[in-house]
Structure formats: C-alpha cells, structure tokens
Amino acid sequence: MSRYRGPRLRIIRRLRNLPGLTNKLVESKKNQVSGSDQSNQKKVSQYCIRLEAKQRLRFNYGLTERQLLNYVRIARCAKGSTGQILLQLLEMRLDNILFRLGVVPTIPSARQLINHRHILVNNRIVDIPSFHCKPKDIITIGAPKTYQSIITKRIESFAKDQIPDHLTLSLSEPKKPKGFVNYLINRESIGLKINELLVVEYYSRKA
C-alpha cells in the first residue's frame, strides 16, 4: 500500500487529530453524531478499535503499510516493550525529529526538506526521511534563502517548551539552525496520543 497523498482533513475527521499530518484541528465524525443516532450505532468490535489505532499511527508518521509492518517486526526482535520500542523507532526518524524540533509544521514538510537535500546529519547530507537518528547526532538545516525565511518564522512562532527533552534546538547560527539528539525519547514525550498496545495486537498475527 502506497503512502496516502489525498485530502488530509478527510483523514483527521475519521481518525481524530494527527499532529504529524496536519496542524489543523477538526471535530471527528464520532463526536458529531447526535444523541438519537448514537442509540442506533452498533458496538465497535475489538478489531475495528485496533485497526483505527494502527491507522492513526500510520497516517501520523506518513508511513506505508509495509513500512509500519517492518517497524513492528524490528520492535518484536528487540529487548523490552514492543509497543514502546515501536514508538521510539518512529519518533527517532529524521523527518519526525525535524517536526518535533519545530523547524517545520508537519512531517510531510520535513520530508520535502530532506528529499531536496537541505538536511545534514553530522555534517553529511542525508536525503532519506526514514534515517534513524541516534543520541549525540547533530542535525543541521542548510536550506537555501527561499526556505530560510519560512523556517525562521516557523521557529519564532514555535514555543520552546514544545520541544521534547530528548532534543535541543540551537539558533547560534540563525541561517543554519541545529538540532541535537540528547538521548532516546521516553514514552512520556511521544507526540501522538495513542495506545500502542492496540497496534501491536493488530499485527500479532501478521508480524
């Protein structure tokens, strides 16, 4: 299954707010159901609940079905909680790191910067959005002038307290902001509200 490129509002109306996909907030279709209609609704199955959790994770981080399945398989082979390791793997992707630093408004925007070869990790150009960042990595945003003003305005409007503790943003060189990965992200700093165990359960027979 390819990466979704359709209307984003349609997705967040169905799956609720996804900060990585869009910064727009809308009321989900479930919340719009009137009291009279609620009585006629069928009970949601456990499969549907797990499917929705999986879809929320996939669309928020902009993954294909195959990519997410591969991440689940990697998490299963690692020591520790499969769900938490899965979230760590997704949060430590380069495109998500740029998003969490406040350099770009969404993960798709971060992916565009990376694909255009404007991002350096440890002084080397990286053009792979899924690149896995590690503690002590230094990420430099070397965007051209056309991007610099946009990035500067974005950073100025982004509250510093929104940057999670495992990351640090340095503006000592305004034209080349730098991000520092301090350590692996912990569960409390995950940007998406989700029950990761539902995703693990969804893939229990597939991974």
From Swiss-Prot:
Name this polypeptide is given: Small ribosomal subunit protein uS4c
CDD domains in the cross-refs: S4
Lineage: Eukaryota, Viridiplantae, Streptophyta, Embryophyta, Tracheophyta
Family annotation (InterPro entries): Ribosomal_uS4 (IPR022801), Ribosomal_uS4_bac-type (IPR005709), Ribosomal_uS4_CS (IPR018079), Ribosomal_uS4_N (IPR001912), S4_RNA-bd (IPR002942), S4_RNA-bd_sf (IPR036986)
An annotated GO cellular component: chloroplast
GO molecular function: rRNA binding; structural constituent of ribosome
UniProt gene name: rps4
Gene3D superfamilies cross-referenced by the UniProt entry: Ribosomal Protein S4 Delta 41, Chain A, domain 1, RNA-binding S4 domain
Organism of origin: Equisetum pratense (Meadow horsetail)
GO biological process per UniProt: ribosomal small subunit biogenesis; translation
Compartments where found: Plastid, Chloroplast
